[in-house]
């Protein structure tokens, strides 16, 4: 029902039955359906007439059959009484005085009620001795009437009633009828009072303690609250609180600390308001430096060295156009050798790119689109730095990335410039006037005047080779060379590679060189490895040296030929 005060169909059926002096009777005829959705059939008997109806509940079925009976019943219906109308009754049970107060607040005019004395009656005394019809001994008192004067702004209204409250309601009702249709007057604040009114409105919502702290903060004055006295029985305590604000102080008393603190703040607040107002200080305006907008260049030379995908996107943003649209067209090739084809679309322009993965294909497609739009190709930033020589980020050693492999043949040992210079100096100092030649087995046991002649010990040549490789000079070779007395024609400088080849040939270092390479590949120390090999197989080296010397015995003119070959090589 929309209105709870409206009568239901069953209530109206009961009124109809009372009016016709019959008894309504409801009967539950049937109940069917599952437990969660049952249907009930109800029968209503009113006099000689019966009606049936169904509903999801017994109550709903009764209401439905009652509605059916009201529409189809032939019994005479009672006349509906009109609702009582009372002028003083307002909708929503709001009294006229309350409604008038709200209207008066909107208008900014207070409503003031003043009671008035009733008019005095004439001084008339009846004849109490005559007991006639019109002169009874005991007279009924005249009913008293109350009068009220209501003032709303410049308007005055009078009300009367049996009680003082009824008189007030009567006056408020007359004021409402007169003021409801009048426009609300506009109140313009007077000069000099508007600011005070605004401040008063703001301060009205703040407590006295908050106002004290605000004033003290503006004037840089310290604030302190202290309970100085506490007296009275436990159920009726009395507290005295002292507040100090700079040079001002006040005390407040109350039955709680909060109340005493509030009263003390109220007292000191009155003294603080007497202080002269603070001078108005204009704050300097803050000037914020505007940041320049990020300039996105869209020239043909912009972005060289950037990623083509980012470069193409920035160019489109600078043009305020739609960003590039990338689509994967196809994927072809063997499982381990895939090839992706990516398409990029910028406006009406379309370009494609291929690559072993989607990222490279997308990059190539963006590069092709840049070339198609008339921009220069993107070059690597590292290549640009190498060309221009600009590497301002780091001047120290480069990070330990793997160095690119060179095309040097295997088995060739590179000597540093320092080692090479020492070897050249020692060679000029010691070898000048000596001859180079291959040693025969006959000369193994004889001291030779040549530079690489071997001492009677079997491992002297190995010692010379090791010293030359490690230090660049050989003290053993110098000692042997000093013993030689036969002068020989000077030989032109020999290349270090030839020297190393000669040492390896006479010592049989082919296996040792490969072992050094294996040691370097395994991360071991090649010198220690070579020394271990030499210490473990000295006898084998001596035997191998004799065989090499027999096979490679050179004629006397071989030294000159070697010198010529070395000169031509240099």
From Swiss-Prot:
Q: Which UniProt keywords apply?
A: Cytoplasm, Endoplasmic reticulum, Microtubule, Nucleus, Phosphoprotein, Repeat, RNA-binding, Transport
In chain numbering, motif Nuclear localization signal 1 lies across 273-291
Give all cystine bridges in this chain: none
**UniProt feature, compositional bias: Polar residues:** 83-94
Q: Does the keyword Nucleotidyltransferase apply?
A: no
Which superkingdom, per the lineage? Eukaryota
Please give the residue ranges the record annotates as the region Disordered. 71-94, 181-203, 387-409, 528-570
| PTM sites of type Phosphothreonine | 405
Q: Does the keyword Translocase apply?
A: no
Q: What is known of its domains?
A: The DRBM 3 domain appears to be the major RNA-binding determinant. This domain also mediates interaction with XPO5 and is required for XPO1/CRM1-independent nuclear export.
This protein's name: Double-stranded RNA-binding protein Staufen homolog 2
């Amino acid at each position: 029902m929309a209105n709870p005060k409206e009568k239901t169909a069953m209530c109206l059926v009961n009124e109809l039955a009372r009016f016709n002096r019959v008894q309504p009777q409801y009967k539950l005829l049937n109940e069917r359906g599952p437990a969660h959705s049952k249907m009930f059939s109800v029968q209503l008997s009113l006099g000689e007439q019966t009606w049936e109806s169904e509903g999801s509940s017994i109550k709903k079925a009764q209401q439905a059959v009652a509605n059916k009976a009201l529409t189809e019943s032939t019994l005479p219906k009672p006349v509906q009484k009109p609702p009582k109308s009372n002028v003083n009754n307002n909708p929503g049970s709001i009294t006229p005085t309350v409604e008038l107060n709200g209207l008066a607040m909107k208008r900014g005019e207070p409503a003031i009620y003043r009671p008035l004395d009733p008019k005095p009656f004439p001084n008339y005394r009846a004849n109490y001795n005559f007991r006639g019809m019109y002169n009874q001994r005991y007279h009924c008192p005249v009913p008293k009437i109350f009068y009220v004067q209501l003032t709303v702004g410049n308007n005055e209204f009078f009300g009367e009633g049996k009680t003082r409250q009824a008189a007030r309601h009567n006056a408020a009702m007359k004021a409402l009828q007169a003021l409801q249709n009048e426009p609300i007057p506009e109140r313009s604040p007077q000069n000099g009072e508007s600011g005070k009114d605004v401040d008063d409105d703001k301060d009205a919502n703040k407590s006295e303690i908050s106002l004290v702290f605000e004033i003290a903060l503006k004037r840089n004055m310290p604030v302190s609250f202290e309970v100085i006295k506490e007296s009275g029985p436990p159920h009726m305590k009395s507290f005295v609180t002292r507040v100090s604000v700079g040079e001002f102080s006040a005390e407040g008393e109350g039955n709680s600390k909060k109340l005493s603190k509030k009263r003390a703040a109220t007292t000191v607040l009155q003294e603080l308001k007497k202080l002269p107002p603070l001078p108005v200080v204009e704050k300097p305006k803050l000037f914020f430096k505007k940041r320049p907008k990020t300039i996105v260049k869209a020239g043909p030379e912009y972005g060289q060295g950037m990623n083509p995908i980012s470069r193409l996107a920035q160019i489109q943003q600078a043009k305020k156009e739609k960003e590039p649209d990338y689509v994967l067209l196809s994927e072809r090739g063997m499982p381990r050798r895939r090839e992706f084809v990516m398409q990029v679309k910028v406006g009406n322009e379309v370009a494609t790119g291929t690559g072993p993965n989607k990222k490279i294909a997308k990059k190539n497609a963006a590069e092709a689109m840049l070339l198609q739009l008339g921009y220069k190709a993107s070059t690597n930033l590292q290549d640009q730095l190498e060309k221009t020589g600009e590497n301002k980020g780091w001047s120290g050693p480069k990070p330990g990335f793997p160095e690119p492999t060179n095309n040097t043949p295997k088995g060739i040992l590179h000597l540093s410039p320092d080692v090479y210079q020492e070897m050249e100096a020692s060679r000029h100092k010691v070898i000048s006037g000596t001859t180079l030649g291959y040693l025969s087995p006959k000369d193994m046991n004889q001291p030779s005047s040549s530079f690489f002649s071997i001492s009677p010990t079997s491992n002297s040549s190995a010692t010379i080779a090791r010293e030359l490789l490690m230090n660049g000079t050989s003290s053993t070779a110098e000692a042997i060379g000093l013993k030689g007395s036969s002068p020989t024609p000077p030989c032109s400088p020999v290349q270090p590679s030839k020297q190393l080849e000669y040492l390896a040939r006479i010592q049989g270092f082919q296996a040792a060189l490969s072992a050094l390479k294996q040691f370097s590949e395994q991360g071991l120390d090649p010198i220690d490895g070579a020394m271990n090999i030499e210490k473990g197989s000295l006898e084998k080296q001596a035997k191998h040296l004799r065989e090499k010397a027999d096979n490679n015995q050179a004629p006397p003119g071989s030294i000159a030929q070697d010198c010529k070959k070395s000169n031509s090589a240099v």
